[in-house]
From Swiss-Prot:
Name by which UniProt lists this protein: Cationic amino acid transporter 3, mitochondrial
Gene3D superfamilies: Amino acid/polyamine transporter I
Distribution of this protein across tissues and organs: Expressed in roots, stems, flowers, and leaves.
Cellular localization per UniProt: Mitochondrion membrane
One cellular component term from this protein's GO annotations in UniProt: mitochondrial membrane
InterPro entries assigned to the protein according to its UniProt record, in alphabetical order: AA/rel_permease1, CAT_C
Domain of life: Eukaryota
Keywords: Amino-acid transport, Membrane, Mitochondrion, Transit peptide, Transmembrane, Transmembrane helix, Transport
Family membership: Belongs to the amino acid-polyamine-organocation (APC) superfamily. Cationic amino acid transporter (CAT) (TC 2.A.3.3) family.
Gene name tied to this protein: CAT3
Gene Ontology biological process terms, A to Z: amino acid transport
Pfam families in the record: AA_permease_2, AA_permease_C
Source organism (scientific name): Arabidopsis thaliana
Length: 609
């Protein structure tokens, strides 16, 4: 029972000062970031070199001339998660992002798995990006043989291992920049992001000129705008959705933002909007230059310009790809130390990772550890086969953020904070309740489901049962979303079983959604966390649709990816059982209301005097 209880204990949030409460005080990160910094982080982390390749592959195999629509639909889908992140990041502006929100709203067990999955995401993501830089860099200098010998790829004799010194060196350079300070590293990211955006603008402007000159030949086809049908366009949307992953990095930097309530939602939203516009305009131009079936799947943009006699554009486009990869690499190295620091502050990881350098005010130990691990992977391993694992961490985090938003709106945790151990012994009369006596998110609904008001014929849910109904409804919608996603993706299932799963899943989803729409949201949401920030619209519909999309993408990642992820998650469970659970800052935590804490502090101050 003790182990199960530890999985559902939740970190409390002190609404009075906007910080997650633990038993210990930690060094804070520098409040140095403003709105332009967040735009640089968001756009730089999102627009990787994938756009220089994806447009060819998706247009040839799925979308055809409707490629821009695929990017638009994928952008709208990503925006659903962005709305959820925008509200929670402005409510709880602290390091940790999805891990932090899950710990406050759902529980320690889920938060640990989210944090553990994000560690995997950023490490493998950074290594994958770094391995992709050297081939593009070599193309700028004239080919693979033109890089200096010390940086060129080599195969270890007798082993099927190709080492990439250039990738490791670049990881160490980026790690060094991140150690200098968040403002310095963000400035550097802004420079390379700006260079990449200028290359994309060149593609749009020069490509549009060529398209008007040649008559947009890519759209004058007998197959029409949807050669693969609407299904092909939607399949293309699912593929290019992963080109929008990266805006969540902005939320990871929340503790270092000067005005988080205003700048975080703007940074997340405008970054995603800019990326969507750039993706769509590049897609429109490239499809107009070359018919979709004639696109080069490996180098679609440079090949499109070469087919019109502009050979030199290939060098500029390769430079843009290198800039995009460098910016994405920094977008992988920056957030992970903040995740490690947040988990170490909560006692789930060793305190080594919570150390913040006093001069640079960055989590230096976590940054160095992240850089070393990513450099080793990038040097020795071809991690391209592990790239799907990055998507698992991201999509699970997106899903839990949407669930956390539903909990914040409908089942707000009690306004309590942990009582410092120094005050526990002399203040037993003031102590409210321990973590063991906290009401669970789900519970048995009492027989007196409604309270009768004075007006005849009017009935309302009492507060206690409203919370329980909301908790069960959230769970029903999650189960329904999973069943629908699984049934829609399992083409090998017998038809009757598949349709039955769809029916049951749809029923669960519909019942949960109707209940959430009909009952009132929790009034305590207005004072939970920072108030006055961004408010996500269309709740509960928006987060529920967000959960459905993310679960569908998760189910379709493939069995091999899930096997690899399961091994990593199993290792995480072992670490949690033998270290995190025992060293958590919530072990034996005693909670009191915020008002009682102030009274206890005053009483203790008088007694000391």
């Amino acid at each position: 029972m003790g182990c199960l209880r530890s999985l559902v204990r939740r970190k409390q949030f002190d609404s009075s000062n906007g910080k997650a409460e633990t038993h210990h005080h930690h060094q804070q990160l520098a409040k140095a970031l403003t709105f332009p910094h967040l735009i640089a982080i968001g756009v730089g982390s999102t627009i990787g070199a994938g756009v220089y390749i994806l447009v060819g592959t998706v247009a040839r195999e799925h979308s055809g001339p409707a490629l821009a629509l695929s990017f638009l639909i994928a952008g709208i889908s990503a925006a659903l998660s962005a709305f959820c992140y925008a509200e929670l990041s402005s409510r709880f502006p602290s390091a940790g992002s999805a891990y932090h929100y899950s710990y406050i709203c759902i529980g320690e067990g889920v938060a640990w798995l989210i944090g553990w999955a994000l560690i995997l995401e950023y490490t493998i993501g950074g290594s994958t990006v770094a391995r992709g830089i050297s081939p593009n860099l070599a193309m700028i200098f004239g080919g693979e043989d033109c890089l200096p010998t010390i940086l060129a790829r080599h195969q270890i004799p007798g082993l099927d291992i190709v080492v990439d010194p250039c990738a490791a060196v670049l990881v160490f350079i980026v790690t060094g920049l991140c150690c200098l300070g968040v403002k310095e590293s963000t400035f550097a990211q802004g420079i390379v992001t700006t260079a990449n955006v200028f290359v994309m603008i060149f593609v749009i402007v020069a490509g549009s000129y060529l398209c008007f000159k040649t008559g947009w030949v890519g759209y004058e086809l007998p197959t029409g705008y949807f050669p693969y049908g609407v299904d092909g366009m939607l399949t293309g949307s699912a593929t290019v959705f992963f080109a929008y992953i990266g805006f969540d990095t902005v939320a990871s930097m929340a503790e270092e933002v000067k005005n988080p309530r205003r700048d975080l939602p703007l940074g997340i939203g405008i970054s995603l909007l800019l990326c969507c516009l750039l993706y769509m305009m590049v897609s429109v131009v490239i499809v107009g230059l070359v018919p979709y079936y004639a696109m080069d799947p490996d180098t679609p943009i440079s090949s499109a310009f070469s087919s019109h006699g502009i050979q030199w554009a290939a060098y500029l486009i390769n430079l843009g790809a290198v800039m995009a990869l460098c910016s994405a690499l920094m977008g992988s190295i920056l957030p992970q130390p903040r995740i490690l620091m947040a988990m170490a502050r909560d006692g789930l990881l060793p305190s080594y990772f919570s150390y913040v350098n006093q001069r640079t005010q960055v989590p230096i130990n976590g940054t160095i550890t992240t850089g070393v691990c990513a450099a080793i992977l990038a040097f020795f391993m071809d991690v391209s086969q592990l790239a799907g694992m990055v998507s698992v961490g991201t999509l699970v985090a997106f899903t839990m953020v949407a669930i956390s938003l539903l909990i914040v709106r409908y089942v707000v945790p009690p306004d309590e904070v942990p009582l410092p151990s120094s005050l526990q012994e002399n203040s037993s009369s003031h102590v409210g309740t321990s973590i063991r006596s906290k009401q669970p998110l789900l519970g048995k609904v009492d027989d007196s489901v409604v309270d009768k008001e004075n007006a005849p014929g009017s009935w309302v849910l009492n507060k206690k049962n409203r919370r329980k109904f909301a908790g069960w409804s959230i769970m029903f919608t999650c189960i329904g979303n999973f069943l629908l996603s699984y049934a829609a993706s399992s083409f090998l299932l017998p038809g009757l079983l598949r349709y039955s799963l769809c029916g049951v899943g749809g029923l669960f989803l519909l019942v949960g959604l109707i209940v959430l729409i009909c009952i009132d949201q929790d009034d305590a949401r207005h004072s939970f966390g920072h108030s006055g920030g961004f408010i996500c619209p269309f709740v509960p519909l928006l987060p529920i649709v967000c959960i459905l999309i993310n679960m569908y993408l998760l189910v379709n990642l493939g069995a091999a990816t899930w096997v690899r992820v399961s091994v990593w998650l199993f290792l995480g469970v072992v670490v949690y059982i033998f270290y995190g659970r025992r060293n958590s800052s919530l072990v034996n935590a005693v909670y009191v209301s915020t008002a009682h804490l102030q009274e206890i502090r005053r009483t203790s101050g008088h007694s000391l005097a």
